[in-house]
């Protein structure tokens, strides 16, 4: 109570009282219910997949050894440095206290020049999935074969929810391995799982904040926004957009939110930096108001020292006026990303509260059990009437 006496006037003076009371405080009991409820895990699916994954890891390992010409400890940074920079003659791009870096960003760049770094990345991804999820999740189940994650409301600076022990939000869904792991999360007998998500919510928020006509029109008309972007930046009709063009546009669409440079785009798409710079230039010609939004957000943050989400959540940006170029560019990325990602997070939190309230009022017996960024997962009794209500 003594803390509240100090904090209440501060929340009100910062115009954060409404967000705190109507969203964050109301969310706490719902998150507690979700943690208690947990989600069912079919451990046998993971046991079976572990055998398949082990074979896959061994296959990649053998390919690496065959290409290099000898066996070595792939997990050893020192041995990996020796293989890449001495034996393969690749040029180091980043130095650490223990030698040249072999982190993901370095390997992604080196993969443009040599097949081994790409294989190392594949090996690491599968090995991490195996150790973090496939081998670990079954041991985290309770007697009812349910896993209970811990949701954290204060774990991110943007307001996004995070979770731990286990982190169920980090399971990749864009590759086959991640989808196999995800398929192990199942409904218990007599129930089904219903998933609902916001389609491209961060891009929708960006369109709203920037009020860019081309981007808003794409969403309002129900057009595939990545296809529409590709058509505009490549100067072709939408029906002539190829899958490769769409992939390029999608990478740029999401990359802009996170301040992607031409260098990073070139690495992601396997193209030259000159071509990547042209794509980004064409993107901002296409969505000129997005460029205006980015510039005005940075300028305003330089003046005030903070940014806000649509709901009024604030984030102070420490190095926005730094003389250090690296610090300032990082601060600028935070300043642009936070209103977009933070607003999306606030919208999803409101949706969680609204959905939970509606399920209770309709007496459906359905329960919200998981939130993964822009997706809500509900466990629902398996009967037609309840499913329709839910």
Where are these regions (language model features)?
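Conserved catalytic core of nucleic-acid polymerases
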Residues: 36, 148-149, 153-156, 231-364, ...
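Extended, hydrophobic alpha-helical segments in both membrane/secreted and soluble proteins
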Residues: 27, 46, 202, 226-229, ...
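Short, conserved charged micro-motifs
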Residues: 76, 383-389
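Conserved "right-hand" nucleotidyltransferase catalytic core of DNA-directed polymerases
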Residues: 1-176, 192, 199-202, 262, ...
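Short, polar/flexible loop-turn hinges at active-site or ligand-entry regions and domain interfaces
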Residues: 7-17, 213-219, 237-241
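Short aromatic/hydrophobic contact patches that present stacked aromatics
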Residues: 193, 337, 377
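Active-site palm subdomain of RNA-directed nucleic acid polymerases
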Residues: 11-23, 27, 347, 351-376
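Function-dense linear segments that define catalytic or interfacial modules
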Residues: 1, 153-238
């Amino acid at each position: 109570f003594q803390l509240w006496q100090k904090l209440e006037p501060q929340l009100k003076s910062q115009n954060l009282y409404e967000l705190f009371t109507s969203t964050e405080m109301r969310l706490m009991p719902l998150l507690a219910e979700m943690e208690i409820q947990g989600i069912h895990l079919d451990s046998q699916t993971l046991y079976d997949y572990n055998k398949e994954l082990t074979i896959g890891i061994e296959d990649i390992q053998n390919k690496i050894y065959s290409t290099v010409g000898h066996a070595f400890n792939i997990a050893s940074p020192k041995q990996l440095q020796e293989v890449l920079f001495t034996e393969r003659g690749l040029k180091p791009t980043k130095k650490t206290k223990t030698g040249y870096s072999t982190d993901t960003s370095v390997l992604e760049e080196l993969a443009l020049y040599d097949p081994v770094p790409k294989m190392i990345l594949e090996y690491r991804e599968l090995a991490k999935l195996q150790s973090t999820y496939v081998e670990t999740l079954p041991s985290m189940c309770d007697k009812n074969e349910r896993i209970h994650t811990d949701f954290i409301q204060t774990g991110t600076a943007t307001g996004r929810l995070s979770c731990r022990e286990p982190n169920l939000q980090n399971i990749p869904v864009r590759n086959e391995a991640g989808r196999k792991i995800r398929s192990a999360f199942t409904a218990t007998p007599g129930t089904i799982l219903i998933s609902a998500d916001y389609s491209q919510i961060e891009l929708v928020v960006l369109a709203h904040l920037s009020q860019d006509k081309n981007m808003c029109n794409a969403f309002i008309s129900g057009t595939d926004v990545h296809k529409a972007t590709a058509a505009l930046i490549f100067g072709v009709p939408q029906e002539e957009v190829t899958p490769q063009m769409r992939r390029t546009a999608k990478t740029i669409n999401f990359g802009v939110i996170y301040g992607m440079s031409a260098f990073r785009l070139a690495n992601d798409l396997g193209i030259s930096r000159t071509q990547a710079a042209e794509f980004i230039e064409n993107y901002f010609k296409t969505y000129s108001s997005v460029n205006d939004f980015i510039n005005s957000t940075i300028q305003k943050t330089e003046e005030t020292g903070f940014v806000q989400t649509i709901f009024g959540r604030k984030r102070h940006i420490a190095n926005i006026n730094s003389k250090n170029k690296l610090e300032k560019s990082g601060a600028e990325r935070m300043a642009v990303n936070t209103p977009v990602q933070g607003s999306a997070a606030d919208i999803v939190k409101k949706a969680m509260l609204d959905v939970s309230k509606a399920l209770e009022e309709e007496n459906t017996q359905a329960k919200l059990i998981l939130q993964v960024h822009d997706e809500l997962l509900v466990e629902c009794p398996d009967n037609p009437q309840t499913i329709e209500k839910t």
